């Protein structure tokens, strides 16, 4: 069984189609690995033992269905996405006990494609965090070193893939929450273009920033999942009517990187970047050049304002989105409130964690009448200038490359008392959310000092995931093979 969990999604699906492996065997292999690794990793908030096995047995009885691109493949879903009949908490006590009666669109599409859900992944509360230490339930650890963080907010999704508990996981990315844990956990993480994947059924953090994407072991695996979950959805007003491409087929169109121009922004390769991350990412860029790519310097001069801009906008949107959670219908409710206003106030105060409360307070402040122009309006203006920066940069290159994070995974608890340093972990990822363009993290090496995974980030123009995935796929095939699963 243990050999099965080392397979990629693409490999296990091929084995399922030829009946070399049954869906039940694939699910059992993942559930056994969950039982073995979960006491230390703590990647999952809910495990679907009986439901997954029952579904697998029913699918085996009917036989493989080649029309379903994920038939029989065990997957994990971030707990920010609604799952019919499976608890969904967004990592918060205020949603404790909440079980949706419907599936989010992304989850529904996975099910239609034949995927089997084996668990719900832990996350920072309401996706507010970079380490998964802000979960109200448990702290997820990095499968490569349990003393270190897995990244966040989709840390559970990254850890569950790296620990061999599933073949793919869905994460959400508001400011780097897919790409950061992908970098820290040594897996592939893709943040699609804003609007590429429906947000219907996702518990929102920052509605103009959030996007759902895959976390997998290989680029081809990520392309397969993106093929399934992407596309227009009438139930999401922000869903784009952009035609979907076959990203898996597109991977075979490019055998090398000749004709590809990669932009290297000086703002992402200098101050604050650790030596081991810089060396690993520069070595990967050198390999890309060997494969025919041309590199050119590009300027993203508004980067210095990106952190402040992002947190003003994200916190403002969070303060609005989280106003709906009051403890009345589900989750934590304060005891013996004297009046309705006290029920709301005390329930929210008791159930929201410190980081969530901090962001609600700041968000309310920047939206207040006296400070709206000074903060929120100015941030919106900077956001527009940042988009112009990227558009201009892409006039001279096809994709942009940078480290996904300034460092490798750091020890648990190291930054919890310093919110500003924690926020700086997102410095290379947040700009893409502000401009709505796609990005991904590709594992390229293990750091020489920490021996932890290093991710290289690729960024592309809006709706050009194809070029980004092609470049990552070619580079992945030509870099020294890295271990995909920590057993």
Swiss-Prot record:
It comes from the Bacteria. GO terms for biological process: translation. PROSITE patterns: AMIDASES. GO terms for cellular component: glutamyl-tRNA(Gln) amidotransferase complex. InterPro entries: Amidase (IPR000120), Amidase_CS (IPR020556), Amidase_dom (IPR023631), AS_sf (IPR036928), GatA (IPR004412). Its EC number is 6.3.5.7. SUPFAM superfamilies: Amidase signature (AS) enzymes. Belongs to the amidase family. GatA subfamily. This is Glutamyl-tRNA(Gln) amidotransferase subunit A.
């Amino acid at each position: 069984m243990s050999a099965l969990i080392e397979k990629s999604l693409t490999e296990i699906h091929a084995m399922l189609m030829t009946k070399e492996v049954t869906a039940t065997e694939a699910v059992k292999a993942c559930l056994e690995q969950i039982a073995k690794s979960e006491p230390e990793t703590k990647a999952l908030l809910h495990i679907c033992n009986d439901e997954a096995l029952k579904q697998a047995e029913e699918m085996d009885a009917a036989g493989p269905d080649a029309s379903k691109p994920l038939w029989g493949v065990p997957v994990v879903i971030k707990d920010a996405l609604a799952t019919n009949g499976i608890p969904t908490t967004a990592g918060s006590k205020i949603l404790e006990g909440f079980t949706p009666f419907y599936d989010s669109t992304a989850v529904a599409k996975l099910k239609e494609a034949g995927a089997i859900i084996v668990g719900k992944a832990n996350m920072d509360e309401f996706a507010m965090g970079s380490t998964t230490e802000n979960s109200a339930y448990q702290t997820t650890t990095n499968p490569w070193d349990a003393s270190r963080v897995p990244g966040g907010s989709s840390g559970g999704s990254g850890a569950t893939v790296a620990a061999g508990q599933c073949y793919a996981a869905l994460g959400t990315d508001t400011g780097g929450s897919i790409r950061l844990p992908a970098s820290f956990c040594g897996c592939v993480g893709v943040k699609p273009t804003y609007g590429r994947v429906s947000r219907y059924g996702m518990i929102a953090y920052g509605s103009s920033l959030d996007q759902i994407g895959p976390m997998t072991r290989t680029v081809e695996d990520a392309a397969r999942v993106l093929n399934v979950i992407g596309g227009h959805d009438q139930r999401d007003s922000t869903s784009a009517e952009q035609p979907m491409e076959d990203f898996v087929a597109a991977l075979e169109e490019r055998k090398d990187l000749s004709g590809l121009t990669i932009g290297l922004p000086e703002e992402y390769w200098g101050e604050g970047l650790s030596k081991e991350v810089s060396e690993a990412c520069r070595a990967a860029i050198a390999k890309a050049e060997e494969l025919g790519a041309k590199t050119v310097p590009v300027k993203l001069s508004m980067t210095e304002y990106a952190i402040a801009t992002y947190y003003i906008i994200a916190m403002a949107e969070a303060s609005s989105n989280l106003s709906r959670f009051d403890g009345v219908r589900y989750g934590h409710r304060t005891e013996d409130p004297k009046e309705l206003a006290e029920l709301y106030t005390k329930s929210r105060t008791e159930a929201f964690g410190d980081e969530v409360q901090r962001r609600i307070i700041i968000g309310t402040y920047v939206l207040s009448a006296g400070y709206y122009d000074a903060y929120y309006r100015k941030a919106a203006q900077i956001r527009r200038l940042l988009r112009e920066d990227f558009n201009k940069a892409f006039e001279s290159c096809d994709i942009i490359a940078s480290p996904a994070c300034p460092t490798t995974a750091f020890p648990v608890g190291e930054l919890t008392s310093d919110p500003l340093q924690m926020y700086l972990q997102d410095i290379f990822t947040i700009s893409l959310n502000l401009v709505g363009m796609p990005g991904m993290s590709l594992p390229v090496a293990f750091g020489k000092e920490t021996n932890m995974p290093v991710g290289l980030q690729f960024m592309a123009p809006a709706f050009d995931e194809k070029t980004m995935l092609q470049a990552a796929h070619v580079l992945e095939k030509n870099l020294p093979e890295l271990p995909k699963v920590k057993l």
